[in-house]
Design a protein with these regions (language model features):
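Glycine-rich, flexible loop/turn motifs
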Residues: 11-14, 18, 45, 57, ...
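DPxDG-like acidic metal-binding loop motif
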Residues: 5-41
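Active-site catalytic microenvironments for nucleophilic, acid-base chemistry
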Residues: 31, 48-52, 138-142
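Surface "functional belts" at beta-alpha junctions
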Residues: 35-129, 163-164
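Catalytic-loop motifs flanking and including active-site residues across diverse enzymes
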Residues: 21-24, 89, 131-135
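Acyltransferase
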Residues: 124-168
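N-terminal beta-alpha supersecondary unit
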Residues: 1-8, 129
Length: 168
């Protein structure tokens, strides 16, 4: 009875993990008759970084091979490029360099570094997981703005279709 809302990561991420997390959150919201707040996983990853870097931030998650989910925003969390998926190459992200540094954070940083090979990119953390601590300020803002999800129609943001491979 002490809950005012439930916040959940909406993706991108693991298909199964997103399904389980969102189903659990929706169940709590239905049972307690409280609103659901969803936060982009990539925003959660970068939220802790915004207060101590200058320049644009790219949060990313390694999907598979050289493919990454990413989101680009400035250090005030204003989105510059919505969540996308891309096969990275040495020219990826060049258009997001500003007058200040470009910061990349997320999962799969070591693979990203090998592909980009760019000395002008700052990697503040070697690997950064989505953290519930980083969700707090993002969730509070959405709660105050009454930015809630429709419990019936809300679905995870998978970004791309499910990928199956044959057993080897």
């Amino acid at each position: 009875n002490d809950f005012a809302a439930v916040a959940v990561s909406k993706g991108p991420g693991s298909y199964t993990g997103l399904r389980v997390g969102i189903s659990s959150a929706k169940g709590l919201c239905y049972a307690l008759d409280i609103p659901l707040i969803s936060i982009n996983t990539l925003e959660i990853i970068g939220a802790g970084l915004r207060s101590y870097v200058k320049g644009n931030i790219i949060s990313l998650i390694h999907a598979r091979e050289d493919e990454f989910y990413y989101l680009v925003y400035d250090n005030k969390m204003k989105i510059i490029k919505e969540t996308s998926i891309e096969y990275l190459n040495s020219n990826s992200f060049l258009k997001f360099y500003g007058e200040q540094e470009l910061n990349i954070i997320g999962l799969g940083i070591n693979i990203c570094k090998k592909i980009l090979k760019n000395k002008k990119i700052n990697y503040p953390d070697s690997e950064s997981l989505p953290s519930s601590k980083n969700m707090v300020s993002l969730s509070e803002k959405k709660f105050k703005n009454e930015d809630f999800e429709n419990l019936i129609y809300f679905e995870p943001n998978y970004v791309k279709n499910f990928y199956l491979s044959k057993k080897k």
